[in-house]
């Protein structure tokens, strides 16, 4: 598909230093590169109501991956058992989540926090204001943007001290009531204009 693309839409935070030359190859083939200010979650998500006070035993949604995805090799880290102690867990594991997939984002928003191996779930959770501990070596431009924009994302990588990052995450849970989320750019409108569509809501 990349060889046939006339137009390519990437976010403004696209990091060409980690894309293996993909974007430059498309540009050299004559594709027109368009930039969207925002993350993909800003196109399909809406900020949701979330708990303002953390439960005495924090309610945490935990997302584990199967690990057979195209990007998973070298990125997925085991979630340390120590960070799962003292919480009420909702299992949201890939391929084993028992709830309604269409209500997944709403389910996440009703928790005090998220612990995830999935960069997608982590990004969507923090966009909704849910403090999230991402356990992964993944490097993505959108993760850097979420951090720099002030969303409640905590990243545990293989070279980090588990106890330090875990302590930061726990402290972040208790700042939820004073968390002032950044305004979202109007990514939905930008995307609608790009595809020549009109928003109906």
Residue spans for each PLM region:
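A nucleotide-sugar donor-handling region in carbohydrate enzymes
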Residues: 6-74
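Donor nucleotide-activated moiety binding/catalytic core segment of transferases
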Residues: 93-121
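Structural loop-to-beta junction motif characteristic of Rossmann-like glycosyltransferase folds
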Residues: 6, 113, 129-133
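Catalytic donor nucleotide-activated moiety binding site of glycosyltransferases and closely related
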Residues: 62-64, 78-101
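Short acidic-hydrophobic, aromatic-tinged amphipathic segments that line or gate anion-handling sites
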Residues: 33-37, 97-99, 152-162
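A conserved, positively charged/aromatic
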Residues: 1-10, 108
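Catalytic binding pocket for nucleotide-activated donors in carbohydrate/polymer assembly enzymes
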Residues: 127-176
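C-terminal amphipathic helix plus adjacent low-complexity
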Residues: 171-201
């Amino acid at each position: 598909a990349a060889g046939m693309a006339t137009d390519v839409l990437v976010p403004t935070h696209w990091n060409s230093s980690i894309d293996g030359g993909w974007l430059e190859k498309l540009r050299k083939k004559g594709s027109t590169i368009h930039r969207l200010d925002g993350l993909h979650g800003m196109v399909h998500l809406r900020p949701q109501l979330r708990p303002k006070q953390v439960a005495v035993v924090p309610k945490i949604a935990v997302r584990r991956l199967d690990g057979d995805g195209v990007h998973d090799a070298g990125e997925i880290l085991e979630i340390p058992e120590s960070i799962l102690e003292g919480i009420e867990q909702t299992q949201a594991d890939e391929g084993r989540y028992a709830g309604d997939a269409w209500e997944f984002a709403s389910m996440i928003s009703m928790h005090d926090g998220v612990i995830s191996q999935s960069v997608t779930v982590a990004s969507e959770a923090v966009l909704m204001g849910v403090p999230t501990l991402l356990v992964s070596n993944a490097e993505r431009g959108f993760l850097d943007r979420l951090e720099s924009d002030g969303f409640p994302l905590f990243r545990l990588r293989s070279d980090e001290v588990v106890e330090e990052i875990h302590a930061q995450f726990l402290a972040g849970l208790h700042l939820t009531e004073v968390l002032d989320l950044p305004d979202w750019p109007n990514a939905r409108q930008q995307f609608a204009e790009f595809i020549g569509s009109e928003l109906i809501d």
